[in-house]
Amino acid sequence: MNDQRKGDHAEPTTHFGYQDVPESQKAKKVAEVFHSVAAKYDLMNDVLSGGMHRLWKRFTIELSGVRAGNRVLDIAGGTGDLAAKFSRLVGPTGQVVLADINESMLKVGRDRLLDRGVAGNIEFVQADAEKLPFPDNHFDCVTIAFGLRNVTHKDEAIRSMLRVLKPGGR
């Protein structure tokens, strides 16, 4: 939060791309962007990152320490790339929750994983990273990949993630 005030009653601002916007408007602006690109998000990611996002995701999986039977939360999981990989690691005795605040992204991810037949141990939940609707100490691993940049109150999101992460979790 930049907390730039233009007077005593001005609302705090936060970043959105290359501009500052009132905090109350950021979630709406982010939602509009992701609703409009959901169907083409993976292609855009390939083009904009030169395919590097695939390496970053592989690196995330390798460092996660996730194994069979674990419970994983993938926040801002969108189209399900990480969730699919985690699903294979945790196996039938584990669980992956793909959470995304954006209904369009969540639908694309759910449809894609169902079409691939890898959604058997994946639950799809529309959720705000700042107010995760899960019990305390519930997950062995919590990831957010590129979604943290779109969260308005990053400190609240991190607190929420730590709350649902088991002691010793990653």
Swiss-Prot record:
Gene3D superfamilies: Vaccinia Virus protein VP39. One of its GO terms (molecular function) is 2-methoxy-6-polyprenyl-1,4-benzoquinol methyltransferase activity. InterPro entries: SAM-dependent_MTases_sf, UbiE/COQ5_MeTrFase, UbiE/COQ5_MeTrFase_CS. Residues 1-22 are annotated as: Disordered. The keyword Metal-binding does not apply. PROSITE patterns: SAM_MT_UBIE (PS51608), UBIE_1 (PS01183). Pathway: Quinol/quinone metabolism; menaquinone biosynthesis; menaquinol from 1,4-dihydroxy-2-naphthoate: step 2/2; Cofactor biosynthesis; ubiquinone biosynthesis. It comes from the Bacteria. GO terms for biological process: menaquinone biosynthetic process; methylation. Its EC number is 2.1.1.163, 2.1.1.201. Keywords: Menaquinone biosynthesis, Methyltransferase, S-adenosyl-L-methionine, Transferase, Ubiquinone biosynthesis. Residues 1-12 have a biased composition (Basic and acidic residues). Methyltransferase required for the conversion of demethylmenaquinol (DMKH2) to menaquinol (MKH2) and the conversion of 2-polyprenyl-6-methoxy-1,4-benzoquinol (DDMQH2) to 2-polyprenyl-3-methyl-6-methoxy-1,4-benzoquinol (DMQH2). Belongs to the class I-like SAM-binding methyltransferase superfamily. MenG/UbiE family. This is Ubiquinone/menaquinone biosynthesis C-methyltransferase UbiE. It comes from Ectopseudomonas oleovorans (Pseudomonas oleovorans).
